[in-house]
Structure formats: C-alpha cells, structure tokens
C-alpha cells in the first residue's frame, strides 16, 4: 500500500472477514466515533472558512463545491439540500462532480484524473472573484480538484481545500486548507466510510452556519424554507405559529395573506403592519427578521 493515510490498513479490522456481525458493527461504530473528535480539532480553521463564505455570499458570491467520486457526490448533495432548506437558487450553492451528473450514480472513467475538465466546468458556471471554491478530496491529491483550485486562484476567487490526509497537494493550492486525519478506513481505501462521514459533517457546518450568517435562520428555525410540498407548507405555518405565539389557524391565515412568504408573515404580525410595509422592512434589513422587527 502507499503511504497515504486513506490507503493505509486499519489494525482494528485486519480480521474483518472473520468477525461476527455484531463484532463488525461494534468495530465500525468505534471507528466512526473517532470522526467528530478529529473535526473538533479543526473547528478554528473551519470558522475562518465560514467567515469568508458568509461575507462573500452577502456580496453576491457563490459557494462552489468541487470533487470526484464520493467527495463530489457529497458536495452535490449539500448544494441540492440548500435549495429547499434555505430557499437558495441553484446558482448560489453549486456542486461540481468530475464526470458531471452521470457520475452521481456511475463511475466515469478518467474524469477525476483531468485537471482541464475542472477548468471547463468552472468556466461553464462563469466562476468569478466573488466566489468561494471548496475543493474536496479524501486523498488530497485528486487532479480534478487540483485543477479547480488552480483555476480559482488564477481568477482571484477564494479557495478552500478539505482532505482526510496530512500535508496534501490540495492544501498547498488553497488559502484555507482543512485537513482531517480520521485514520485508516475500516475497509482499506474505502473513503466513502470515515472520510466521507467527515466530509459530510464539515459541509453540513459550512452551509448551515453560512446561511445562519446571512439571515436565513431565526433562532434555530428555517425561516427561508422553500415550501414545495404540503409537508413544508405545514412546517412553514408551524414556524409562524411558534415565532408569533398564535394558533395554527391564525398562522395559516397570516401565511396566506403574506402570499406564502414566511418572513413577511412574521414581520407583519410582530410589527402589526401590512404586507407591503413588511416587505420594505425586510428589504431594508438584509431580509433578517430580528433586524426588521427592531428597526
């Protein structure tokens, strides 16, 4: 095996094929528990990243995840979830995966080995200096990710690298390198396991806390949720009910009178103003409810 931590053999699982099911489960669970602690150790560095993503997002910049295989799929997943959760557009948080949409379900031969493909993908979305490009690669040496970070640097965009090794190539190419050493995988080289878990937790933090910073959360409530189905409409009404301390029926009526805009409904009620005035207050206060009701 090579000297990459993500390719090293795990001493705890040398006899995985001889373990009982419960032994294998206990071993995997013990290994998985190491991941959050390793992430805890890099929280100060992650905070610096989120300061940048928040500020750039406020200025019209985008968060662009770029990766291959599992890493790419996790970036695409996080970007996709931002649309219903925070009512972002599909052009505000973007996930690029080597090989394109097809690579979400099947391996696209050679895609991750191409630096030029990353450049083409970033050119296609009109990468600019306001954007933040977050390269994700468990090994820290994926050419597709390296090409993306090089391209971003040339354009003047902010760059972040997330890897699960130490002293990685992508770390050398980024302004904000994040290295999480989760140790060897339970199944040697299968970075969909602990490495993938670490990446998912980190992306959860980046997107969630960035969206808190730009005003898409009130307390711990999703006040910018995009209500695209009955479950989310019901959630929106219950959020209004909770914030405004009114009945469900009152919240539903308020929601309808605000043209199903949760934030507008809340400001209308708490400030005792009409829809037009509520919209103006929100526009004047960067769409942050707490600022709108204070001013």
Swiss-Prot record:
Domain of life assignment: Bacteria
An MF annotation (GO) of this entry: carbohydrate derivative binding
Record keywords: Carbohydrate metabolism, Lyase
Cysteines engaged in disulfide bonds, as pairs: none
Record-level GO BP terms: amino sugar catabolic process; N-acetylmuramic acid catabolic process; peptidoglycan turnover
Pfam families in the cross-refs: GKRP_SIS_N (PF22645)
Residue numbers annotated as active site: 81, 112
Domain spans labelled SIS: 53-216
Additional note from the record: A lyase-type mechanism (elimination/hydration) is suggested for the cleavage of the lactyl ether bond of MurNAc 6-phosphate, with the formation of an alpha,beta-unsaturated aldehyde intermediate with (E)-stereochemistry, followed by the syn addition of water to give product.
Function: Specifically catalyzes the cleavage of the D-lactyl ether substituent of MurNAc 6-phosphate, producing GlcNAc 6-phosphate and D-lactate.
Alphabetical list of PANTHER family matching this protein: GLUCOKINASE REGULATORY PROTEIN
Name listed for the protein in its UniProt record: N-acetylmuramic acid 6-phosphate etherase
């Amino acid at each position: 095996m090579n000297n990459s931590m993500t390719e090293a053999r795990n001493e705890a699982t040398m006899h995985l094929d001889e373990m009982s099911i419960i032994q294998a489960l206990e071993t995997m669970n013990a290994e998985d528990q190491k991941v959050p602690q390793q992430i805890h150790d890099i929280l100060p560095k992650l905070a610096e990243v989120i300061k940048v993503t928040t500020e750039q997002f406020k200025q019209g910049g985008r968060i662009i995840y770029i990766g291959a295989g599992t890493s790419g799929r996790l970036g695409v997943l996080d970007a996709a979830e931002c649309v219903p959760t925070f009512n972002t557009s599909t052009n505000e948080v973007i996930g690029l995966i080597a090989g394109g949409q097809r690579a979400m379900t099947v391996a696209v031969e050679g895609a991750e080995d191409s630096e030029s493909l990353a450049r083409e993908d970033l050119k296609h979305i009109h990468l600019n200096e306001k954007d933040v490009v977050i390269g994700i690669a468990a090994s820290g040496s994926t050419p597709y990710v390296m090409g993306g970070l090089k391209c971003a640097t040339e354009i003047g965009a902010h760059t972040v690298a997330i890897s699960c090794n130490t002293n990685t190539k992508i770390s050398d190419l980024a302004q904000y390198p994040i290295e999480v050493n989760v140790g060897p995988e339970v199944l040697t080289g299968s970075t969909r396991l602990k490495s993938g878990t670490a990446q998912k937790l980190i992306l959860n933090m980046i997107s969630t806390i960035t969206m808190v910073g730009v005003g898409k959360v009130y307390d711990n409530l999703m006040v910018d949720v995009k209500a695209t189905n009955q479950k989310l409409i019901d959630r929106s009404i219950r959020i209004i009910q909770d914030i405004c301390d009114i009945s469900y029926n009152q919240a539903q009526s308020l929601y309808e009178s605000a043209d199903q805009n949760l934030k507008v409904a809340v400001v209308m009620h708490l400030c005792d103003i009409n829809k037009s005035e509520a919209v103006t207050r929100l526009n004047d206060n960067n769409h942050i409810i707490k600022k709108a009701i204070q001013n």
